């Protein structure tokens, strides 16, 4: 079931690229560590994910520049997280600071029980454009259910992201 959900999510993400014009799709691929601050040491594992952003939906507001973000990841313990939310963009010289917030669906698989299927991801990403339309970033995120579930252990994750605007 978890694998089917991930395949569906990836298919939808790649479908955006098939129908978009040149420069309409920003795809990110990332890998890193799930539950990086695991006190017990039994839930830490690897993660791999994909994220989609549409530059055409980019909005410049009084609070900054924002665009929608949709993505998902799977961990080495078969946990799956699918999310959609909003990402801000702030420039600091050649660096981009990209905070984001995204509610999503979490399935624990054989991994960490986060207490609910509804989980919220807050993330801070620092990126640097390495080639034209390509960015390399470091991200740190926290996922928790805001005490809406039976338990709320939360998880902190870190990963490296490669983004390409097609």
Predicted regions and their residues:
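Short loop/turn motifs that connect adjacent beta-strands in outer-membrane beta-barrel proteins
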Residues: 19-24, 55-66, 91-97, 133
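Residue-level signature of outer-membrane beta-barrel architecture
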Residues: 52-56, 88-90, 128, 142, ...
